[in-house]
Amino acid sequence: MSENVIFCYSGTGNCLDMAKTIARELGDTDIILMRKEPAVTDVRDAKRVGFVFPCYGGGLPGGVEESLRKIQVGLTAYTFGVCQYAGYMGSGLYKLNSIIPLRYWTAVSHQCTCIWLLPHSVMLPPVTPAMAQRRADKKAKQIAQDVLTRAVSPKAPPKKPVNQLESSVWPKIVAGKAQKFAVSDACVACGQCARLCPRGNIRIEGGRAVIGGNCIQCLSCLQYCPQQAISIGRITDRREHYHNPNVTAAELTESIIHID
């Protein structure tokens, strides 16, 4: 096992890009993706263990809490958490800290990828995608330096009861939205969406993608579709699609990414 481990959930690449930037600064790091159940959960030999994830519906992405409860971290390991968000960081860091106590935590604003809910420009303060990327890169390097010096956050992540309530109803909202997926005639049945889906919720049938109801709204399928053939209501056709420019669709399907 590498000296450093970062567990990462990423739907459209922003969090994986941040995890990779942090890993390059730390060196000798295994990034373990959490889109599905992690390939490795016993990381007691790692000296530093981090977690990078987005805010989904005010909390953790679907399935992440269950995975966190299976992870074994060494008693002397330095632990850190990073949440990326658009408008607000939510209660995800609070939930993570209640499961795996964090020595250090922070939150970073980046592009909103839930375009059926909000436009990308919802970031606070509003910035262009290029500006948001530069800001995230700079912040990732700062985080890595804090981790290398074993910085300690002065207080625990805030509880944010309103966001906890939001997170509790989010699965019902997601279930409703899953019924509104549509695939246009632009689909060329390339299969990229099916390979990306962490729930195996997409299949190629009759020369086009068919999307089922077991969706957690990572939106990898929509944002990485090379033909922009996938939508969730008309509003997603009107809004610009986005995925992180530094992360390929293939990387999101990996289980572990090692960075020297």
Which residues make up each language-model segment?
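Membrane/wall-proximal cationic-aromatic binding patches
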Residues: 38
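A mid-sequence, solvent-exposed acidic-amphipathic segment
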Residues: 160-198
